[in-house]
């Protein structure tokens, strides 16, 4: 038996973790020299944000260095307070400063109409159109078996209970027009088909496979205004 054992490291063991970095950012990372470890650590943290590369992160950090210490402290405290104190509405699961969000608490909104969306970004997108006067229900995702997301991981049962309890008159689906979105619509429709609730969906002004949050306000407003019965939508 050979008593000599040599460990030959893999190339990946010798390189830094560059997952998620573009080729340009990787090259920049390899050549970037930091005069301060504190500066480098701050840049690395900013670069973890979506859509922020190393160059942009460096510009942000250098901008903060130019600011008064009081402004930087206020900035960091605002972010920390948002993360620690923000809540999710107990009724619709939108983000909120209180147990019930400002939309659900607004008596001027149509409390008998619910717009079902995938995430909070979709709520913001629809609100920016100023064309919807009802309330929302945030599912927290869409059914996607390939991603391990089933109905039990979403706020679907809470939606069914809410429709029954609040005697909802119209349920508007505003989910992204893709296979996962259509699967989610079909599943929920079957769950509530015996309830006296009109079920509609936004018109297909958004290209199939697209995402709701990236639609421009005019297209989204038109899709809301021309919503159609879900049976008609699913038959296309």
Language model feature labels by segment:
Residues 113, 117-118, 168-180:
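Acidic beta-strand-to-loop metal/phosphate-binding motif
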């Amino acid at each position: 038996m050979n008593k000599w054992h040599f460990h030959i490291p893999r190339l990946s063991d010798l390189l830094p973790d560059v997952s998620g970095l573009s080729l340009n950012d990787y090259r920049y990372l390899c050549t970037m020299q930091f005069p301060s470890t504190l500066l480098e650590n701050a840049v690395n943290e900013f670069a973890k944000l979506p859509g922020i590369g190393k160059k942009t992160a460096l510009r942000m950090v250098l901008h903060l260095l130019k600011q008064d210490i009081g402004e930087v402290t206020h900035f960091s405290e605002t972010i920390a307070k948002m993360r620690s104190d923000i809540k999710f509405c107990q009724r619709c699961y939108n983000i909120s400063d209180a147990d019930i969000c400002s939309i659900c608490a607004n008596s001027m909104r149509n409390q008998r109409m619910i717009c079902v969306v995938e995430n909070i970004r979709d709520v913001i997108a629809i609100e920016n159109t100023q064309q919807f006067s009802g309330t929302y229900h945030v599912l927290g995702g869409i059914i996607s078996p390939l991603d391990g997301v089933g109905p039990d991981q979403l706020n679907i049962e809470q939606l069914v209970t809410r429709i029954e309890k609040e005697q909802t008159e119209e349920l508007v689906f505003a989910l992204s027009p893709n296979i996962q979105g259509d699967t989610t619509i079909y599943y929920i429709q079957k769950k509530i088909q015996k309830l006296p609730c009109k079920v509609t969906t936004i018109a297909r002004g958004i290209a199939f496979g697209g995402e709701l949050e990236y639609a421009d306000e005019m297209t989204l407003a038109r899709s809301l205004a021309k919503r159609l019965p879900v049976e008609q939508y699913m038959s296309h």
